[in-house]
Swiss-Prot record:
It comes from Drosophila melanogaster. One of its GO terms (biological process) is regulation of ecdysteroid metabolic process. One of its GO terms (cellular component) is nucleus. Belongs to the nuclear hormone receptor family. NR1 subfamily. The gene is Eip75B. It is found in: Nucleus. Residues 1-96, 110-204, 258-298, 321-448, 837-878, 984-1021, 1044-1064, 1108-1174, 1204-1317, 1368-1401 are annotated as: Disordered. Induction: The expression of this protein is developmentally regulated and is correlated with the 20-OH-ecdysone induced activity of puff 75B. Keywords: Developmental protein, DNA-binding, Metal-binding, Nucleus, Receptor, Transcription, Transcription regulation, Zinc, Zinc-finger. A zinc finger (NR C4-type) spans 458-478, 495-514. Implicated in the regulation of ecdysone-triggered gene hierarchies. Probably plays a key role in mediating the regulation of the larval molt by 20-OH-ecdysone. This is Ecdysone-induced protein 75B, isoform B. Residues 565-813 form the NR LBD domain.
Amino acid sequence: MEAVQAAAAATSSGGSSGSVPGSGSGSASKLIKTEPIDFEMLHLEENERQQDIEREPSSSNSNSNSNSLTPQRYTHVQVQTVPPRQPTGLTTPGGTQKVILTPRVEYVQQRATSSTGGGMKHVYSQQQGTAASRSAPPETTALLTTTSGTPQIIITRTLPSNQHLSRRHSASPSALHHYQQQQPQRQQSPPPLHHQQQQQQQHVRVIRDGRLYDEATVVVAARRHSVSPPPLHHHSRSAPVSPVIARRGGAAAYMDQQYQQRQTPPLAPPPPPPPPPPPPPPPQQQQQQYISTGVPPPTAAARKFVVSTSTRHVNVIASNHFQQQQQQHQAQQHQQQHQQHQQHQQHVIASVSSSSSSSAIGSGGSSSSHIFRTPVVSSSSSSNMHHQQQQQQQQSSLGNSVMRPPPPPPPPKVKHASSSSSGNSSSSNTNNSSSSSNGEEPSSSIPDLEFDGTTVLCRVCGDKASGFHYGVHSCEGCKGFFRRSIQQKIQYRPCTKNQQCSILRINRNRCQYCRLKKCIAVGMSRDAVRFGRVPKREKARILAAMQQSTQNRGQQRALATELDDQPRLLAAVLRAHLETCEFTKEKVSAMRQRARDCPSYSMPTLLACPLNPAPELQSEQEFSQRFAHVIRGVIDFAGMIPGFQLLTQDDKFTLLKAGLFDALFVRLICMFDSSINSIICLNGQVMRRDAIQNGANARFLVDSTFNFAERMNSMNLTDAEIGLFCAIVLITPDRPGLRNLELIEKMYSRLKGCLQYIVAQNRPDQPEFLAKLLETMPDLRTLSTLHTEKLVVFRTEHKELLRQQMWSMEDGNNSDGQQNKSPSGSWADAMDVEAAKSPLGSVSSTESADLDYGSPSSSQPQGVSLPSPPQQQPSALASSAPLLAATLSGGCPLRNRANSGSSGDSGAAEMDIVGSHAHLTQNGLTITPIVRHQQQQQQQQQIGILNNAHSRNLNGGHAMCQQQQQHPQLHHHLTAGAARYRKLDSPTDSGIESGNEKNECKAVSSGGSSSCSSPRSSVDDALDCSDAAANHNQVVQHPQLSVVSVSPVRSPQPSTSSHLKRQIVEDMPVLKRVLQAPPLYDTNSLMDEAYKPHKKFRALRHREFETAEADASSSTSGSNSLSAGSPRQSPVPNSVATPPPSAASAAAGNPAQSQLHMHLTRSSPKASMASSHSVLAKSLMAEPRMTPEQMKRSDIIQNYLKRENSTAASSTTNGVGNRSPSSSSTPPPSAVQNQQRWGSSSVITTTCQQRQQSVSPHSNGSSSSSSSSSSSSSSSSSTSSNCSSSSASSCQYFQSPHSTSNGTSAPASSSSGSNSATPLLELQVDIADSAQPLNLSKKSPTPPPSKLHALVAAANAVQRYPTLSADVTVTASNGGPPSAAASPAPSSSPPASVGSPNPGLSAAVHKVMLEA
């Protein structure tokens, strides 16, 4: 009884992985035999065994004992040295391949058959097993064959596609009698199968009970070693082990018994298998579906044709065997050894032959799938007898080598154990699910199959196809015709009937020209010849396709009658609508009445309305739950439309995906109440239109939706009309990707006819009503597209923001102690930062602008009563919901590479900024520093930098202050600082030069810009103007607050600044559309995030943090702790002085100033609200792309700037200068006072001491902190000597000469530098063509000479006059070329010597004081 115990062990080990049918049974459970790869030896052994068995048939058990190697769990690894069949990992260096024989224990589940008699040992050899079964009474034989616990040995080799698998056939259960009869034939190996198209296959031999059950090549891709795509032809490289010769009458009785038992019950459904793991591979499923659906089981004739598809061959041996076992069990009762001899032969072949056949057998039992090795492919159909005859004839003609029973699919590899093992063990039910588990519709891969009932038809003439020939299913006649035509290269006489003869079975010989033409047209090709059997999975596909076509024909007939019956169709659609829609007239009228009588207003953040793309975090779940039900209603409604269920899964998905929101809008349109200008949310609350958040381009969307709703509601559609209109919106034949267009068009036309009927009935006096209604469909689609985009953007942003929050918490904790920033400040920063990544960023600057935390509520907590532009009012909530606000504002934590990775220390950070300027200036970006008073700057930043085209900045400041307390962790990046560059939001930021950049900005209220123009840019423009006004007001009310107005760089005419931006986007429809498209993610920040854990970045951040800490400690009251603390502030130069109110107002009035300039000049991190949007701008700012020369120059300038800034800062308040530039401390008020004298031209005076450490360019983002610290200390010392220089130095950033900002920074302030003992080099640049639009594209033309000269002059001056200061004035007269005069001047000569241009001058004078 060892065998029984072994079998039990196998069962336990197999678990529920499925019972593998075996030819041993409980009474004769067999032990595993590993089949030697040398099959010749195996034949000899088996011969001997067979003789022994014949001598003592009854004692087969004991015989098997002698052969038994090990119980089931044993795994034998045998290495066969064979010429390398394929250069895969299995091939050893010596050219041999390791063939691993493993019992398939995973998939083996012992079927506990109570009827099993004594425990028969696992019989090793086929002969033993067969002999045992032969000698055993039929019952025993059945048990033998049904034993599921027999272990399998799977030999898997990866073979080249064109390698013949020369194998000597060991007797296989299917060919045993043949083995006896024709040993000589068996000794010769059958002609190898050439799988020439398959490049990598795994040759799998499944040995169960010592018999080679299956020898098949499976696509390697399906297996663990899979390398190549699935073959286009049969996977099994060779037929099951022994060539199956036409077994007309001589099959041994035991063979018959076994196969009878296996497959006789023609339609008996297999008993449910032991709990199978995941569903089995599709081939089984489809066949089984085919059988289980009541179609007669595939019979031999039915089996004739199999479509060869390139799907992976999933091995399903176990399930097939299991099914076979079950069938055998059922069959046991009606079996007699020789009765069903013929059927058995066929069935046997089928059952052992292919996974598809076996699955079909499993399901239907009696389908015989004879698969010939020649291209004749058998597919199962119900015409058994005909096919049997055909096959037998072919078999006899083909002879033994040509035909062999397709093997059961090789068992799945362990990799797929979960799914395929279940398939192996699973019964037909599981099989049914299996093909679907692969996710492919059976018919989808066989679009060209034509069926007549269950018969595949020839694609050329419509006759009964005999197989898959030359790439298509064709009959023998057309196959031969095509073969003759191509082999003999026959040139047929051209057709005399216009070459349009219809080729039918009855007339196919009349016109050979047209017949050949049609052969080629349907896809016949000499190259499509396949060798070997049709892959089993394809066979299964064909069966499924047949079955489906049969079903579909019946269903379509029923559907045709239903669609043609208009009243019935009307009733069905109306019923579906009423059952699935919660917003019928009655229900909604009650809700509207209640809303008017006692409105319960919903705050936008808590909005539960389909149009709100961004419900606040806590309400998002509730919103989703409430709204999911509505969406489900639409899906259910679609499913109830007659004919929808007949569509393929792909078509259903396509229609629903494209039309879901359209139908949803039609249903929800009644929730918009234009009388009270509000929307009734799904939770019954009312939300006013002006309260809906304007973020994420939502204002444009909301306005459009309200307009559309008003238009639709004015039509007063009835429920029947709404239901039919929803159906038409869903079932639209013009959706791309539809397959069954014919049916969809038919449904559409019928539904449209129903709608026309209803409309004519309800509105006899409005004949044009239907046309008017259908005209709304394009608008409806546009709305749903916009809405979907916003939702997608919101989701992405949301995830991004959450992620940012999570990792910002660590940093935030660090920075918390140092920064007592007000929460709003940090929050604004967060938004700012968020803007960089926000996909919305460039899309909907409008909304972001609206969302900008411009709401006074957020700004005033600072106590600054700043008039916020009207646009910002609606978004007051945004700041209160920082996360939401950040999300909607299109912000994304702007962790610029410069800030995060590369700004390890202040030196690096500033190098980043200035260096990137050098890079940017070449690309036409302008960096306009505005010098501000420190206090002003901080306050203004708290107020937010309004003029950033996103008023977000305005609120950014205040919001920053509040929110920094709330979200200090966010603040860490965000406030990182003033250095955060914001990409320009202007239309130019897309890299597209519209040519319409005008200097006038129409003042437009936030609500007014909801035309189809790019909401974002138009609002930006409006915001710029309004921001300018607001800044001006702020400056007036709070002279201490100087607002840095940074607007997209447009021609800066200070006088026209308020009118600058409005028209820009309005005139560019294409640009509007471009800007509405969701932008790409900010790749820099994404990379940053990816590399954040990297130790290099950690170290840099750590260093940053330390410097920031030191700076914070040294910072004085003059500089806000805001500017001092954040480690991320490092990129910001020490002192960015805010210009005096006059300067600020000029700047504010000048929307033309680049936002970039604002970022650069903005000293306190609070201002970092305006984070960059466009990936293009960001990439332009990415410093690593600078050339070494640029880096060197930027380094020099940066060091100078740092030193000078720190000097300026320290001059006013001791210790400020000591702060490393990373602290981005704003210069003391005195500096600002000096700066108040600056004219419209921005002047950068950098005074650095001789001992400035390194001019050598620090590698990107990693300038040594020591250099920065030394520079700061040196600058502090120099600053102490030179208090007034602070104003001059306050402008840290190198102003790109073509910065168009006309900030009123009077060069007079440069006199501050006069005190410093260090020699100064003053570079004054007048930019003539300040009106030139900013072009961010990397291929932008080089800056005009005036700007170029400024850059070059600055850099060259530094290099040329290392010890000497010079006034280099590059003045670009508006008309003429710039005159650059470099005159060495004593350092004492005040820079003021360069007369400050009047603020009104259009030429911006950039004065760069470079210390030698």
